């Protein structure tokens, strides 16, 4: 585990991808790129890039045989920039969905998003998240479901209208 008291104290890259366990291969592409740049943990005989990966299960979206691989992980490194990352259905967010409790037909698109804040002295703290939830996305201030499993009888209702969402917690209780 990555911990300040352990031998390896630095991460050289982080890989977020879809593809279930197959998507882990994308991290090896990032490792190859970083190795070529001379980055990595020095183990005397080589430098080993430390690239933790977080992978989403999204095989039910699109074709299950199309998934991230080492070449895509390498290409992602080549495409990296200092610009803000794309949000929505890009990268790891491509196949992300929310509200799957009633099946994929009632689910909604999830995605990827990021935020950052400068906390002073030039220190910038950032976060990136890929939302691929089985249940609902709930506004913590109001408790209102803002994305999730859609009721089968949606009809002409607008998103967020009463009856539009099937409350995952209620579905689980029944």
Where are the regions that the model predicts?
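Active-site-adjacent structural elements in enzyme catalytic domains
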Residues: 32-34
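A structural signal for small-residue-enriched, beta-sheet-centric alpha/beta enzyme cores
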Residues: 1-21, 25, 36-174
């Amino acid at each position: 585990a990555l911990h300040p008291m352990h031998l390896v104290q630095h991460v050289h890259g982080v890989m977020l991808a879809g593809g279930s366990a197959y998507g882990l291969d994308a991290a090896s592409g990032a490792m190859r790129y970083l190795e070529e740049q001379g980055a990595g943990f020095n183990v005397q005989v080589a430098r080993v890039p430390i690239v933790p990966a977080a992978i989403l299960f999204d095989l039910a979206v699109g074709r299950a045989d199309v998934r991230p691989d080492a070449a895509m992980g390498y290409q992602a490194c080549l495409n990296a920039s200092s610009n803000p990352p794309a949000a929505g259905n890009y990268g790891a967010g491509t196949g992300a969905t929310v509200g799957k409790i009633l099946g994929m037909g009632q689910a909604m698109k999830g995605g990827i998003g990021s935020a950052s804040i400068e906390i002073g002295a030039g220190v910038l703290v950032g976060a990136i998240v890929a939302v691929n939830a089985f249940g609902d996305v709930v506004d913590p201030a109001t408790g209102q479901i803002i994305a999730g499993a859609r009721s089968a009888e949606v009809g002409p209702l607008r998103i967020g209208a009463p009856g539009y969402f099937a409350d995952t917690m209620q579905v689980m209780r029944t």
